[in-house]
Amino acid sequence: MEKKLPIMCPGCGGSLMVKSLYCESCETTISGSFSLPLFLKLGQKEQDFIMEFVQSSGSLKQMAKSLKLSYPTVRNMLDDLIEKITQLKTEDL
Amino acid sequence: MKPSKLFNPFEEIAGAKALFFGFVVMLITGLTGYFSFTHFPDMISIKYIPEYLPLSYYFVQQVVIWLIPSLIFYVFALIGSSSSVRVVDIFGTMALARFPYIIAAVLGFSGSMKRFGDYLMALFMEHDTTATISTFDIVTAIVVMFLMLLLTVWLVALMYNAFRISSNLKGGKAVGLFIAGLFISIIATMLVNIWLYGLWA
């Protein structure tokens, strides 16, 4: 089973930071305080949407066809995603 | 088919495809209405008028009750939405949203509505106390009226979803603009239809 990367604190709902990174081959552990990349702060569905968007060469029409959704539905999903990214960027500042 | 698709098929169908099916819906509704004497005097009303009018009148009426609301909702979408709104989405989904009224046109074939109307006219307008009607006609007319009410609710829900999806509006803004658009559309289509009826009748 693929583990989901938690991005929100289950206790208080706040944003999580990366405290340590581990190398499996040499077993080195790096400790510190790193913020998550913006892409990882998005939900799984939103990440999948971006991947699909890139794979469709940014064509919403092609995406709508492959997802079996109407063009305005896909465009609305993109607009909502743009809004969320803008919001996350503002929060990071 | 999922029940949600009956009220919101626009997540999957919009644009030119919806416009094509919408035109088919309007053709069927107009043709059925011609034979069943079912009129649509404004965007949401259904009326039974047993009077001969040419087929072209029924088709033009269908175009009027689709074109005017589509135009009004398109302007409202441009005003309220920050997304890019495509004309074909608004006009297409608004056309397809009219599919419940095919059933309304079919319900017009029920003679009970006419007999119930004639009975009420005789009783209350002409004070004819000898007027009679069968229990079957009363029950059928009430059932048909109730079904027509449900069809109107269905149509309005479809139109709201058509507007919401095509314009990417949400919450109070979507509801507010839709209610305003609906109100203006009803008045505008009613006035144009009165004028049209005068031309043909």
Give residue spans per PLM region.
Chain B
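Membrane-helix interface motif
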Residues: Y34-I44, F109-A122, W195-G198
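Juxtamembrane boundary at the C-terminal end of a transmembrane helix
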Residues: I187-A201
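Hydrophobic alpha-helical transmembrane segments and adjacent short intramembrane/lumenal linkers
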Residues: D89-F178, I184, A188
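Alpha-helical transmembrane segments and their helix-start/interface "positive-inside/aromatic belt" motifs
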Residues: K5-V25, V88-F99, G172-I179
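Hydrophobic, aromatic-rich alpha-helical transmembrane segments
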Residues: G15-L19, K47, E51-F59, V63, ...
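Alpha-helical transmembrane spans of integral membrane proteins, capturing the lipid-embedded, hydrophobic core
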Residues: G22-G30, Y58-L71, M94-R98, I102, ...
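Alpha-helical transmembrane segments with an aromatic anchor "belt"
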Residues: I49-L123
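N-terminal juxtamembrane cytosolic/stromal segments of multi-pass membrane proteins
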Residues: M1-L53, F76
